[in-house]
């Protein structure tokens, strides 16, 4: 299993329910051959206007909104977010043919100003019985561990970091817990149904102290690479599962 790090790659918001509640299946849309960005609003209680290169693309965007995708030429672009108490601009480089997510979210520190991170979606081919998942930590909490089907497979993922995994298609139970703790989950457990040959981008956001923890998710269809056997997790004795890396988002706000 490979967990790395950001919602409508192309489609809808997926709201998290109470512990044990199913959150799927996720519906996939086709990937585009052109360069594009999708913009995700992940700041609870905020309403923002969004502009790309000075052109307004949305007004009054609320938490959970997934805007786009917006087709862009390769090269440098700027995305700005404005609203009551919010004035954030983020510059990014868009690669040819890339699908890039731009996420407005809160930092780990309570009361911190919103930040923006962006990253390219991993849209490479995948085996017919596999699903690819990207889980990003964009919540107002300390570093967290990720449990999949009751097993801790990623540890110490900080705000602005992510994990990427390829898993067998089907339903998986996912929970976010305080790093190194056996306490109750910060989020979940959630039953997430993943269709074969899809990429699901899942963002954990909000603050468990005020009950605003939730997720935003979107999916896209992937092409097959002919491989049949799903990737499995080779867990290590500490830290991440062997062969897995957790990286910060590609670009900062």
What are these regions (language model features)?
Residues 12-253:
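Intrinsically disordered, low-complexity polar regions and short flexible loop motifs
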Residues 1-10:
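Sec-dependent N-terminal signal peptides
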């Amino acid at each position: 299993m490979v967990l790395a790090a950001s919602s409508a790659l192309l489609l809808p918001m997926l709201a998290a329910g109470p512990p044990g509640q199913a959150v799927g299946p996720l519906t996939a849309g086709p990937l585009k051959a052109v360069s594009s960005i999708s913009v995700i609003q992940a700041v609870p209680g905020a309403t923002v206007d969004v502009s790309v290169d000075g052109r307004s693309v949305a007004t009054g965007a609320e938490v959970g909104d997934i805007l786009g995708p917006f087709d862009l030429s390769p090269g440098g672009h700027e995305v700005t977010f404005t609203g009551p108490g919010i004035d954030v601009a983020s510059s990014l480089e868009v690669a040819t043919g890339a699908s890039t997510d731009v996420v407005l979210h809160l930092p780990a520190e309570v009361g911190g100003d919103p930040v923006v991170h962006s990253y390219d979606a991993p849209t490479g081919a995948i085996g017919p019985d596999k699903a690819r998942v990207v889980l990003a930590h964009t919540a107002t909490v300390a570093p967290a561990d990720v449990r999949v089907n009751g097993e801790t497979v990623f540890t110490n993922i900080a705000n602005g970091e992510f994990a990427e995994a390829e898993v067998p298609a089907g339903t998986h139970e996912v929970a976010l817990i305080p790093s190194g703790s056996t306490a109750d989950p910060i989020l979940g457990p959630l039953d997430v149904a993943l269709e074969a040959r899809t990429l699901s981008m899942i963002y954990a956001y909000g603050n468990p102290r005020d009950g605003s923890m939730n997720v935003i998710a979107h999916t896209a269809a992937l092409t097959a690479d002919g491989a049949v056997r799903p990737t499995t997790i080779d867990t290590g004795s500490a830290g991440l599962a062997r062969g897995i890396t957790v990286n910060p988002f590609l670009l900062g706000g």
